[in-house]
C-alpha cells in the first residue's frame, strides 16, 4: 500500500486499548473465529488474536475498502469482494490484519496489501502512487486496453505533484498535474480543481484539451500476500498437492501445486543431501523477510524431513530461459527485453540495499509471470549447497560461464560478482537464451576471461546496451556499476523523464 496508508496504520497501532469501546465488535472471552469453511485447514490458531494492544476503533481511521477480491485460504481468514468496506480491528501482524466486514458482519484475517483507507487516493482504481513513467507506459500499453485508459501517479521530479498518463492508440501521453498553493490541482490554469477526484471526473466527461477523454482506470495486478496465510510457515506436506512438474534441475524438481485446496503455489523439492536442513532453516528465515515486487515471494517450507520443500508464489511463464528460448518470449522485441532486464535489476537493487548476495544469477533463476513480469528466484540458496560438483569451480555443476572470475577462482562472492552475472544474464536476454561464450568449454572460458577476453557484441544488440554489459564485466569488482545504477539506466533506456510531458491542446506528436 501507499505511504498514506502506512503512516495512518502506524498511528493507529499507537492508539490506547479500546477493547471495551462500542466501536469494537470483539468482546472479552468471545472467539473471533466466526467463519467455518469446509475443507480448509486450521493452522494452529486455538486462541483469539491478542487484542491488547494494539486496537483500532478510536479517533483514527479504522474503515478501509477492499481493492481486490479475496477468498479465504484458511478457516480464520475473511473472504471479501472488491469495494467491500471493512473495519480494521487489529494490525499487530503487519501482513495479516484482523477485520470485520461491514456487509456480512463476519470477522477474520485479511491480507493488508489488499485494502486501503476509505476515501484515500490509495483506494482509487486510477491511483498508482510511486509507479514510474516507464512502468506506467508498460501497464497502459497492455493489449486490449482502449484509448483513454489512464492512471495518476506521483511525479518523479516534483514532490507533491502528480502525473496523468493516458493511452492514446498506440502511444501514451503524459500530463503534469501541478498543486495549487491553496491545495487544489490543475493541468491548465484555466481549469483548477479542489482534488484529484474532481480532476478525474471532469476529464472523464470531456477531453477539454487532453488527447481524449478518460475512459477506464488502468487495471491493477493483485499484489502478492505477505506469506501464504497468517502464521503458516512450516506447513504439513499433506497440505500440498503437487499437480504438474514444471522442470527438473541439478538439485531437485519444481512443481505446480495447490496448498490447502485453496491457493496455487510452486513447490521446489530439493534432492536429499543437497544442503543441511538446519542451515536451510536459518537461511529461509532471512529469505522470507526479503520482499519486493521483483523477487519471488517465499511462502512456506517443509523441513521436517528430506526432501525439503520450498513453497513460493506461482509464476505462470516459468523460467526466463525457457520463456525466451522456446516459450511465448521467442518473438519479443528489444524494448520488452530491456524492460525485463530492468525488472531484474530492480529486484537485485533491493537485495543490494539489504546487503544480500544472490550467488547464482542467471536466466534459469528468473521467473516470468503475466504481462512480462520478471522476478528473481533462488536468491541465497547457492551458498548452502553441499555438492562438491557445484562448490568446486572445476566441478561439472558449477556455473562458470555466469560467475565472476574472483568468485570462480577465489570464492570471493559479493554483490559485485552478482553484477558480473547480471551482465551475462543481459546477454542471455538479448540472444533469447543462447548459452554464454558459445563454442567454449568451461575451462576455456575461465582461462580466456582471466586474460581479458569478453564476449563480443551479440547480433541485434545495440552498442549502448553492449557497453552496459562491458561495465558489468570490469576486471576490478569495485569499478562495476551498482544495481541501483543499472536499474535506472535500463528503465530510462528509451525514456527521458525530462521530455514528453504535454500541455493541454498540444498537437499530437
UniProtKB/Swiss-Prot annotation:
PROSITE patterns: PROTEIN_KINASE_ATP (PS00107), PROTEIN_KINASE_DOM (PS50011), PROTEIN_KINASE_TYR (PS00109), SH2 (PS50001), SH3 (PS50002). ATP binds at residues 246-254, 268. It comes from Hydra vulgaris. The active site is at residue 360. One of its GO terms (molecular function) is ATP binding. Residues 126-218 form the SH2 domain. This is Tyrosine-protein kinase STK. Residues 1-23 are annotated as: Disordered. It catalyses: L-tyrosyl-[protein] + ATP = O-phospho-L-tyrosyl-[protein] + ADP + H(+). Keywords: ATP-binding, Kinase, Lipoprotein, Myristate, Nucleotide-binding, Phosphoprotein, Proto-oncogene, SH2 domain, SH3 domain, Transferase, Tyrosine-protein kinase. The keyword Nucleotide-binding applies. A lipid is attached at residue 2 (N-myristoyl glycine). CDD domains: PTKc_Src_like (cd05034), SH2_Src_family (cd09933), SH3_Src_like (cd11845). Residues 59-120 form the SH3 domain.
Amino acid at each position: 500500500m501507499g505511504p498514506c496508508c502506512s503512516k495512518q496504520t502506524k498511528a493507529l497501532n499507537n492508539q490506547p486499548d479500546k477493547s471495551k469501546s462500542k466501536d469494537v465488535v470483539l468482546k472479552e472471552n468471545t472467539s473471533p473465529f466466526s467463519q467455518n469453511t469446509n475443507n480448509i485447514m486450521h493452522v494452529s490458531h486455538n486462541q483469539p488474536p491478542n487484542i491488547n494492544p494494539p486496537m483500532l476503533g478510536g479517533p483514527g481511521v479504522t474503515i478501509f475498502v477492499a481493492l481486490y477480491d479475496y477468498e479465504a485460504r484458511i478457516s480464520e481468514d475473511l473472504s471479501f469482494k472488491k469495494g467491500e468496506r471493512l473495519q480494521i480491528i487489529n494490525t499487530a501482524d503487519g501482513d495479516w490484519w484482523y477485520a470485520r466486514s461491514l456487509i456480512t458482519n463476519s470477522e477474520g484475517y485479511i491480507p493488508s496489501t489488499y485494502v486501503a483507507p476509505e476515501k484515500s487516493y490509495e483506494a482509487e482504481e486510477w491511483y498508482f502512487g510511486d509507479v514510474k513513467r516507464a512502468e506506467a507506459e508498460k501497464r497502459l500499453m497492455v493489449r486490449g486496453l482502449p484509448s483513454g485508459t489512464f492512471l495518476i501517479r506521483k511525479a518523479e521530479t516534483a514532490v507533491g505533484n502528480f502525473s496523468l498518463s493516458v493511452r492514446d492508440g498506440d502511444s501514451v501521453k503524459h500530463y503534469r498535474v501541478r498543486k495549487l498553493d491553496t491545495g487544489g490541482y490543475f493541468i491548465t490554469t484555466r481549469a483548477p480543481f479542489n482534488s484529484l477526484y474532481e480532476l478525474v471526473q471532469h476529464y472523464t466527461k470531456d477531453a477539454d484539451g487532453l488527447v481524449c477523454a478518460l475512459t477506464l482506470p488502468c487495471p491493477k495486478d493483485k499484489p502478492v500476500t505477505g506469506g501464504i496465510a497468517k502464521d503458516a510457515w512450516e506447513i504439513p506436506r499433506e497440505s500440498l498437492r503437487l499437480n504438474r512438474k514444471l522442470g527438473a534441475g541439478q538439485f531437485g524438481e519444481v512443481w505446480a501445486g495447490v496448498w490447502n485446496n485453496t491457493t496455487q503455489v510452486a513447490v521446489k523439492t530439493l534432492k536429499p543431501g543437497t544442503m543441511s536442513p538446519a542451515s536451510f532453516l536459518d537461511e529461509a528465515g532471512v529469505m522470507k523477510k526479503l520482499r519486493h515486487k521483483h523477487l519471488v515471494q517465499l511462502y512456506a517450507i517443509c523441513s521436517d524431513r528430506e526432501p525439503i520443500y520450498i513453497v513460493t508464489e506461482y509464476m505462470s511463464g516459468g523460467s526466463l530461459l525457457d520463456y525466451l528460448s522456446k516459450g511465448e518470449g521467442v518473438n519479443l522485441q528489444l524494448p520488452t527485453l530491456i524492460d525485463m532486464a530492468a525488472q531484474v535489476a530492480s529486484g537485485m537493487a533491493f537485495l543490494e540495499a539489504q546487503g544480500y548476495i544472490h550467488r547464482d544469477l542467471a536466466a534459469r533463476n528468473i521467473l516470468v509471470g503475466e504481462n512480462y513480469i520478471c522476478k528473481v528466484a533462488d536468491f541465497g540458496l547457492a551458498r548452502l549447497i553441499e555438492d562438491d560438483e557445484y562448490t568446486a569451480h572445476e566441478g561439472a555443476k558449477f556455473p562458470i560461464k555466469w560467475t565472476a572470475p574472483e568468485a570462480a577462482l577465489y570464492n570471493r562472492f559479493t554483490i559485485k560478482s552478482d553484477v558480473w552475472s547480471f551482465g551475462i544474464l543481459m546477454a542471455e536476454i538479448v540472444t533469447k537464451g543462447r548459452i554464454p561464450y558459445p563454442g567454449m568449454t568451461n575451462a576455456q572460458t575461465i582461462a580466456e576471461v582471466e586474460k581479458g577476453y569478453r564476449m563480443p557484441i551479440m547480433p541485434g544488440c545495440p552498442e549502448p546496451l553492449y557497453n552496459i554489459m562491458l561495465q558489468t564485466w570490469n576486471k576490478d569488482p569495485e569499478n562495476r556499476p551498482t544495481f541501483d545504477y543499472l536499474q535506472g539506466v535500463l528503465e530510462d533506456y528509451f525514456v527521458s523523464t525530462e521530455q514528453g510531458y504535454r500541455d493541454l491542446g498540444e498537437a499530437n506528436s
